[in-house]
Amino acid sequence: MTADTRPLHSGSRRLVRRTLLLFLCLILTLSAATLPAYAEDAPASSDVGVVLLLNLENNLVLYEKEADTPVYPSSSVKIMMGLLACRSLATRLNETVTVSSAMVAGITGRSLHLADGETLTVRDLLYAAICGGYNDAAAVVACLSSGSVAAFVEDMNEEAARLGMTHTNYTNPTGLHDPAMSTTARDLSIIAREAYGNELYMLISSARTYTVPATNVSEARLFTNRNSLISDSSQNYYNGYCAGMNAGMTDEGGWCVVTVCERNGASNLCIILRGLDVASGELIPAYVQANRLLSWANRNYGYRTVLSAGETLDTLRVGMTGISKSKADVVPSEDLKIYLPTDLDVEGQLVYDLVLDDEGLTAPLTAGDNVGTVTVSYHGSIVGKAPLTVTEDFKRNGFLNALGLFKGYLMGRSFWLAIPIFAIMLLPYLYATGSSRGRYGLRTVQRRKRIRYIKRHF
């Protein structure tokens, strides 16, 4: 038989080409479906000197640059100022106060132009200092909180020390440049977390605008939030997911932007320090970089279920049951979700540690009893915890229970305290028997020897 070497008709050739094309498309589709998705790199931050991006729920650092380098704090000082003022003045919001020239003496920079003798409410002053970023208002609330600006600065440094902000020193409540004043992004994240937990501070620092009503010396004053991520006055920077905190600049410290992005169930703290200043009309790099980083985090991080309720983590022996093979499944009592990279291999890159409340499991146990904690670590840091429970009941053996109580008594303090008391009580008897040794000496010796003999035989 000879092979058919006749050329294919054009219709047949088209059919072959279509078949091959469909086959190649199928291979490419399947390959794409099986390829792992890798997280993209964080956006470059060459125009800002210091960056820290932190997930607040899990205290997980998403991105950092020079986060432990001491820098001039610039306007970020107002986060500490605002928090302490909100704590101190929360019950006085409707109180009317009078500004004195002494309160604002020597204050320069961004100003609401508060006048000597002007009366306005504590609420107005807090909004002006925190939302508007006005230095003269910050000085007045410092005086209202602690009696003087100097005393308030002492309170700021005491709070920083209490919180463990070891690289931070304040010399004023405004952020105006002073070579003696410094902080780090890591330190700043500590006070920012505290401020995020203060409802009044977050309410004020998240306001887009505020109007100070007309006073005895001024017409009504409307201002926007100093932080352009919060204020929608500039669509170049506005981020509808951002809440609160602070922004501003000094020539020496550069631009600082601090905010919290609340999106998809996560709260991410973004800190930018030493941002470059630019000419009027150009985009401010600190704002641009903050938005880029927050968008990057939203694309590449999310909440992952790393433990499921009832999932057996280990099977451990249960003591005091009287049954040598009594074992209990140890399980988390609740699901645990942790904010992690979306491409993370949960099984391969997380470390799970079981920490039991006691050295081991001991009956009696009831299903659902908490017996310890499972901690989950990522890159050496604990990022989540869940309580551990057992799934069934275990009764204690009566004989082993009594034996355990007796052992506990022997090992207890009361037993050892009783020994010297018993010895003291025995002394009179020993003295009495010793004084009669001459009369009954032979009998006593014989009795002792007999006892020893019996002991040897037994």
Q: Residue locations for each model-derived region?
A:
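N-terminal Lys/Arg-rich, disordered targeting/topogenic segments
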Residues: 1-12, 436-458
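Sec-dependent N-terminal signal peptides
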Residues: 14-27, 418
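Active-site-adjacent loops and short helices of periplasmic peptidoglycan-processing enzymes
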Residues: 37-186, 190-204
